[in-house]
Structures are given as structure tokens and as C-alpha cells.
UniProtKB/Swiss-Prot annotation:
Originating species: Aeropyrum pernix (strain ATCC 700893 / DSM 11879 / JCM 9820 / NBRC 100138 / K1)
SUPFAM superfamilies: AMMECR1-like
Top-rank taxon: Archaea
Residues annotated as domain AMMECR1: 29-214
InterPro entries found in the cross-reference section: AMMECR1, AMMECR1_dom_sf, AMMECR1_domain, AMMECR1_N, AmmeMemoSam_A, Uncharacterised_MJ0810
UniProt-recorded name of the protein: Protein APE_1056.1
Family annotation (PANTHER family): AMME SYNDROME CANDIDATE GENE 1 PROTEIN, AMMECR1 HOMOLOG
PROSITE patterns reported for this sequence: AMMECR1
Listed Gene3D superfamilies: Hypothetical protein ph0010, domain 1, Hypothetical protein ph0010, domain 2
């Protein structure tokens, strides 16, 4: 038991997003919500059982958004990048950290719980992009891929929905992924910088404690007129 969470050994191969259905996604969002509320209200980490698909190793991010006027603003986003924990425990860890440890924000308060919606992103395996920089943009599709940039000691990750929400094309996506890693925006043009793409599945509450839906990022990108591929 660590911090009130039973850390079970993850069993089986890492889970891929396409293996999860909407019932799994809703369960993960509800668990993330409970983990946030348990931490904010009682200072305890949620104790969860890791079994079945959700007990396999998984990588996940939890995003918190607070209602602001007619829209939503980011309130916290942290994740477990590598599948080192059972998926359900990765979600609990990410949820607590998003509510308490995102360095961009103060810890979430009790008064905010009714105004915050929860989103869970399950990451797939990392696929390295070619070393030849000119080949990279054509292999990135906005609405399908997220990006992870690494040049030790620097590293940074952008979830696929970020590019959709911001309306970026693949080159802008690569540029901002480099910046996220603390590197120059042109770092994707360097062969010594490792860049990975990954797929993901995203579920979120439509409103605080409300229905849970899967985000269709490709459809969202098309509706916004995003240039999803390099022409």
C-alpha cells in the first residue's frame, strides 16, 4: 500500500486504446472523478482494485477543465507517460496529481469541484518517427496522433486533442511539441531529437459529474477546418 493506494503488479501486455470500449472509458472517468474528490475533500488517495483490462499496464492522462463563462478553461493536466502501472492506478495517480501538483496551478479547492469536468486520455504505444526530419510531418495526422519529444534531459508530450483544440496543422503540432519539451520550436528538424507519435482514446464528462462521452477527435478537427495532414 502506497499513499492509501494498493499498488498491484500490472499483468499482461500494455493496453492499447482500441481495446477499450465506452463502458471502460466511462468507468475510468468515474474513477478519476472519485480520486479527485477523495483527495480534495479528505486528503486521501482512492483505493482501487486493478483487475481485467483495466488492470493491465497502461499510460494515461487526466485533464481537469473549469467552467468559465460559456466555455471551459484548463485547470490541471498530468499523466503517466509509460505503462508502468495498472491502467486504473495510472488514472488514479494522474487524477490526484492533476488536482494537486500541476505546477501551473494552485491545488484544486473543494469549492471548485462542482465546476470542474474530468477527461481521461488512454495512450497507446509510442512509435518513433524517422530520423530524417523532412519525412516527419507527413507521418503526423492531427486528430489521430499525439506527440512525444525527447532529447535527454529534455522531454515533452502533447495529447492529440491539444492540436485539435488549438487548430494546429502537423508542422505547428511538431513545433509546439518541441517547445513543450523545453527545446527550440525547430527541434523536430534535428536528427538527434527523438520524436514519437502515439494514438489515444479520450473520454470526458459533458459537465461536472454528468454523462461521459468519447471524443471523436478526427470529426472535431474536420468540423473546425483543421489541416490534419501535410498537403
Amino acid at each position: 500500500m502506497v499513499g492509501g493506494v494498493r499498488i498491484a503488479r500490472a499483468r499482461g501486455p500494455p493496453i492499447e486504446p482500441e481495446e477499450l470500449d465506452d463502458a471502460d472509458g466511462e468507468a475510468l472517468v468515474r474513477i478519476a472523478r472519485r480520486a479527485v474528490e477523495e483527495w480534495v475533500e479528505h486528503g486521501r488517495r482512492l483505493d482501487v482494485e486493478a483487475g481485467g483490462k483495466l488492470g493491465r499496464p497502461g499510460a494515461a492522462f487526466v485533464t481537469l477543465e473549469r467552467r468559465s463563462g460559456d466555455g471551459w478553461e484548463l485547470r490541471g493536466c498530468i499523466g503517466v507517460v509509460r505503462p508502468v502501472l495498472p491502467l486504473v492506478e495510472a488514472v488514479v495517480t494522474a487524477a490526484v496529481d492533476a488536482a494537486s501538483s500541476d505546477p501551473r496551478f494552485e491545488p484544486l479547492s473543494r469549492e471548485e469541484l462542482d465546476r470542474v469536468r474530468v477527461e481521461v486520455t488512454v495512450l497507446g504505444s509510442m512509435e518513433p518517427l524517422p530520423k530524417k526530419p523532412h519525412e516527419r510531418p507527413a507521418l503526423v495526422e492531427v486528430g489521430l496522433h499525439g506527440l512525444y519529444v525527447e532529447k535527454p534531459p529534455y522531454a515533452g508530450l502533447l495529447l492529440p486533442q491539444v492540436a485539435v483544440d488549438e487548430g494546429w496543422d502537423p508542422i505547428l503540432f511538431l513545433t509546439w511539441a518541441c517547445i513543450k519539451a523545453g527545446l527550440p520550436g525547430t527541434c523536430w528538424l534535428r536528427e538527434d531529437v527523438e520524436i514519437y507519435r502515439f494514438r489515444a482514446a479520450v473520454w470526458r464528462e459533458t459537465e461536472p459529474r454528468g454523462p461521459v462521452v468519447r471524443r471523436d477527435l478526427a470529426r472535431e478537427a474536420a468540423a473546425k477546418g483543421v489541416n490534419a495532414r501535410v498537403s
